[in-house]
Amino acid sequence: MVNQSLKNKKIIISAGASGIGLATAKVCLARGATVYLCDIDSKSLNKLNKHPLKNKKLFAYLCDASNEYHVSDFFNKVIKKTKKIDALINNVGIAGPTGSLEKLKSKDWENTLHVDVNSHFYFTKKAIPLLKKSKNGSIINISSTAGILGFPLRSPYAASKWAIIGVTKTLAMELGKFNIRVNAVCPGTIKGDRMKRVIKDKAKFT
């Protein structure tokens, strides 16, 4: 039987205050890990203040993952708590605009790729030195089925998720010699506020 204990493991989760990130954090905590999460949503972070493990096993910080300076500041805070981490879960991602490619605004395309791809770069770059200190490190990138199959009327989102798959495969080859595994998870539709907005936007085109 596979040992699912995460006792004494140190895990970083970006965009960890809601949705997939929060659900992942709860599972990690339940299995004994110490979790360092960040999010741009201060209201969601405030809700975590009531968590029984807050400031013991759960450390939550405000951070704009699309801003490299903010990410560096977040890691500086983590390093004050621990000198190594065992896993990084890159969960940042926005839905981006809905519409046919020829009607998209360049700024919306660029913003989607900036947030969804560059955030992974910022976090991974900072995490690798800490992961190398672990005997069995892991990077988990949250991509999407859109990164495998495409997604009509959501080309910026699909492009960003395909990019994550490419980076994942490349880093798996680069970091294997350091005993760092790199994998991507590709969820389908997840119930939540973001999906409600996507459905509402897409309904305008049907």
Give a label for each model feature.
Residues 99-101, 105-113, 203:
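Substrate-binding pocket helix/loop in short-chain dehydrogenase/reductase
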